[in-house]
Amino acid sequence: MGIKHCCYILYFTLALVTLLQPVRSAEDLQEILPVNETRRLTTSGAYNIIDGCWRGKADWAENRKALADCAQGFGKGTVGGKDGDIYTVTSELDDDVANPKEGTLRFGAAQNRPLWIIFERDMVIRLDKEMVVNSDKTIDGRGAKVEIINAGFTLNGVKNVIIHNINMHDVKVNPGGLIKSNDGPAAPRAGSDGDAISISGSSQIWIDHCSLSKSVDGLVDAKLGTTRLTVSNSLFTQHQFVLLFGAGDENIEDRGMLATVAFNTFTDNVDQRMPRCRHGFFQVVNNNYDKWGSYAIGGSASPTILSQGNRFCAPDERSKKNVLGRHGEAAAESMKWNWRTNKDVLENGAIFVASGVDPVLTPEQSAGMIPAEPGESALSLTSSAGVLSCQPGAPC
């Protein structure tokens, strides 16, 4: 009787330990999921948690909107134009920014209603001036080679936007003028400063599988109250100021910013700001940094930066080995900022001088965290960064 009683205690103890065991990564999932679920994770043809949601499916072209369920990080829940119609871009022209014709990208992006925007064929779209993207939009370049040049996208006071599989490069400073930004008449706008994607006062934004390079100012600038942003699976090359999160040290509205930088590759003559953060809370997870010019990750105004599972391969110059760039404060003060490293891999002499303490996360912060894989996995997790070549009837 006593032996039977002890067996019951042991059984329930083991069951309780199993239930309480945290699930942190794909490896953990493989240990506890049934065999068929484990097989689905490892044979989908994907390399990370976002791509695993959709890339292994040959019917993606018939089910494009399934992508809307795949965002992770602080942009999780961004569904773009899922609840709207499919809008097909049939013309690469942008010759009337005040009254764009139906069939152009600018016409679709400005509409007040939700739209899932796709492209009829390969296109090089030379935007004459900045293109304003309204709320509840998906710009989905899968199935075509879509290049945006000369001017970039502006997201101002909007929510729920997905930008996916778009190549943006050679964005220049452009003058203002009357520009269509919604269903109403065109309104005057100031000139744009050469950002590929400029985001202000917006939320629920997801940029995924884009290739961005060679613009005058930033490739992605997010500021002035923007939050719930994920930049993932993208390729950043040939640029000085890559990602800016936060307008200025004096802009305290950015204290509430939550942003995720995940599964991206930074390479081929990128200099700095990958990202540069002010105020706010940032997870930088499982990215591949293949050399830099000035620094990789930087900031000022006491942001919290959690660097997890990244690969940092430093440049060859001995003076450029530091991963981090601290700005705006004396060294003693900046070493109080919570800039933490976990599971990162440092190569070619890279140096990461952590500071502060591991912060206690709020429920909102915890909910947006992506489980970090070891930095040794960063190369495989980012091997498909940038635009994908997707053909209907086959997995991307």
From Swiss-Prot:
Its EC number is 4.2.2.2. SMART domains: Amb_all. Pathway: Glycan metabolism; pectin degradation; 2-dehydro-3-deoxy-D-gluconate from pectin: step 2/5. Keywords: Allergen, Calcium, Disulfide bond, Glycoprotein, Lyase, Metal-binding, Signal. InterPro entries: AmbAllergen (IPR018082), Pec_lyase (IPR002022), Pectin_lyas_fold (IPR012334), Pectin_lyase_fold/virulence (IPR011050), PEL (IPR045032). It catalyses: Eliminative cleavage of (1->4)-alpha-D-galacturonan to give oligosaccharides with 4-deoxy-alpha-D-galact-4-enuronosyl groups at their non-reducing ends. Residues 1-25 form the signal peptide. Binds 1 Ca(2+) ion. Ca(2+) binds at D193, D217, D221. Disulfide bonds join C53-C70. One of its GO terms (biological process) is pectin catabolic process. Glycans are attached at N36. The active site is at R273. Its cofactor is Ca(2+). It comes from the Eukaryota. The N-terminus is blocked. One of its GO terms (molecular function) is metal ion binding. Pollen and flowers. Monomer. Belongs to the polysaccharide lyase 1 family. Amb a subfamily. Has pectate lyase activity. This is Pectate lyase 5. It comes from Ambrosia artemisiifolia (Common ragweed).
